[in-house]
Amino acid sequence: MALEALPPKPGLGMTAELHLEDVQRAVDVELQEHRPQRVLPAEWAPQSAVQLTWPHADTDWRDLLAEVTETYVRLAYEIASRQPLLIVSPEPDEVQSLLSRRLPAAALQNVHFVAAPSDDTWARDHAFLTVLSDNGAELLDFRFNGWGGKFAAERDNAINRRLFDTGWLHGHYVSALDFELEGGAIESDGAGTLLTTAACLLNPNRRLEGDAVPVPDRGQVELLLRERLGAERILWLHHGYLAGDDTDSHIDTIARLCPNHTIVYVKCDDPADEHHAELQAMEAELEALRTADGRPYHLLALPMPDAIHDEAGARLPAPSANFLSMPRAVLRPTYRR
């Protein structure tokens, strides 16, 4: 996977770094007009740090470890050049030694290392979800089960508690292990609206007997999201997928909430492509969605990357929407295209 660092795009509601403060003030004003008592901040909101869970020989990247490590070095550079970076690794000394040779001193000073065993690298899915409330920052530790039991996740599921016990994170630890929820399964606008997919959140493989919501019941799931994340509106998509995707249609692979009532989404214009019908149906769903004040969202389409296949000929997911938003940059995958 190649990586491209982009300045904030006008289509995403950010004109350029020069005007970022003006845009941030506009977003802040919007949130002040309606700020829930509990809120899951939007990804583009100011961040105390970005977490990377570093690849190693026991992760799913083992056969491509050298190449993938190079991508992570580039990720570390792009993030740490702009803001603090938290790196979780079972061998943090080795990672620190590598980055000390590859990153400039100013960026390296922004990197904090934590030792923790891990199964894989999907930090967005196994990391804390931070909710802001009248009590300050609440670090919600939801259960991660390897996307419905497809992969081992016991070590990933223990990272949050280990991180909190280091004392480096600021906020109140809140155990939410009675509910399986991955960060990539939900999008928040920071003002009470969540966007998600039924294929993931209502999938029986995410629910367990004895959980807070033991069955895939939409009403019960919505109630839990309202209580724990402060959601006031939950927008559901029932269409859209990527072939080969293990996440059961994570929203962060197909459609993303962005500033200024914008949704960026994956579009497929090739009628011969297997995704065409589903993504067309998803586009129609997005066109029907409304903001909290009843207006249609601004929709910005991302082109579907050319098909990528593994050595056996199976199609691999290449989610162009699976980018990382930071206050001063957007990092997006390019898949060498």
Q: Where is each model-derived feature located?
A:
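The feature marks the mature, well-folded catalytic cores of soluble enzymes
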Residues: 2-337
